[in-house]
Structures are given as structure tokens and as C-alpha cells.
Amino acid sequence: DVLQILKERKIVYAADATMQAMLSDKHGRTLVVEPGIGWREDEGRYSLITNYSILAPESTRPFVMPEDDRYEKASKMLNIYGNHFTVNNAFSILQAVCQEGIWATRVSFVYSAEENAVYYVQNNNFSQIGKYEF
């Protein structure tokens, strides 16, 4: 349903506001939505987003700090795990790339297609992983 809406309509946010969305289904397919920019459907082993645009990186490049390589770092770590990747591995990556301070990461999510569940951590408290089962 969401994919059909995206094909028929342009999704936008209010002026001077931006946000990405990642939607996933029980088959592990993901849809990355960047309002005003576009969308991408992923069917690989993982899908990854960060604070800057994945679909049009040049649009957010002026706002990215030179040392902010979290997307690239997480992508490399994901590739190292290969076929042996668990929810705990995902959280170890998220912990390695989380932000602290004024722009601290507030929520980190991991969706397990195998379990049809979303795991989450709030405010970088990686010692307390919550779980929501569908």
C-alpha cells in the first residue's frame, strides 16, 4: 500500500523540516523514504540510513560534519559480518556509531524479519534492549 502511494504521490514535509523514514515488512523488504527527494526499495540483507540523505547526498553534504562517517563505518561493519549476523551484532554496530551530546541518538531500531519483531534502545542505553513483537 505504501509503495503504491509513493508511486502516485510526492511525499513532502513542511518548509525547513526534513526527516527520513524506513519501513519494513515481515519479509524483510525495506522502503527508505526521504520526503521531497524520493524513495528506494531495498531487498538485501540489511538497509541502513543516517541523519543525512542517502538518495541525494549532495543535498545534505553542507550540513554533515567532516568527522561524521557513521554511515560508512556502519556499512563496513555490516559487510564484515557476512552471513552470520544477529540482532546483538546490529546493536553493537549501532552502539559504535551512535551520537552523544546535543544531537545524541534518541532511538535505535533493529527489525528481525525472522522473529517478526522490532528491537529498540532509547537514549543510547544499550544495556536495556526493548522488544516489540507483531
Feature roles, as predicted:
Residues 1, 5-7, 14-134:
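C-terminal, well-structured catalytic/ligand-binding subdomain of enzymes
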